[in-house]
Amino acid sequence: MKAEYNFIANIIEKNSTVLDVGCDDGTLMEFLKKNKNVNIRGIEISKEKVQICIAKGLTVIEGNAEFDLKQFPKNSFDYVVLGQTLQAFINPEIVIKELLRVGKKAIVTIPNFGNWKVRLDLLFKGTMPITSSLPHEWYNTPNIHMCTIKDFVRFSETINFKIVKS
């Protein structure tokens, strides 16, 4: 279980409604359903991952959040979760604004490209690091926007996205 799942679970209240955007194989959805008794839905771009989720009995639709969040009504969820995915969107600003429209609260986690281990790897090895949160080679990564925590804070201020907990 990823450490970030516990962080997310500690924020989400029991019996709430949740949309997991980029839900991957549904691991977080299962965790929240079991431990928080939430009514949870997912949206995932990968057809294979959607099939895995459905096989687990989870409610997931195949779609791209950059375009498909528009189909959800305003404030239709208590929480909208976007875990480790923001950097893969062409226009992260649109995605954040849609998260805030669809959910009463948004929970966003990002890989910190400024993490000291990442920087040390780059400094001493001279190559882009491969870690558990950054598992791809530079030429085969879905990440198109690399940012640090400070970059994300500045971005949030620019689009009036208030960070409550970090």
Task: Please report, for each region that a protein language model flagged, where it lies by residue.
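Short conserved loop adjoining the S-adenosyl-L-methionine
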Residues: 68-74
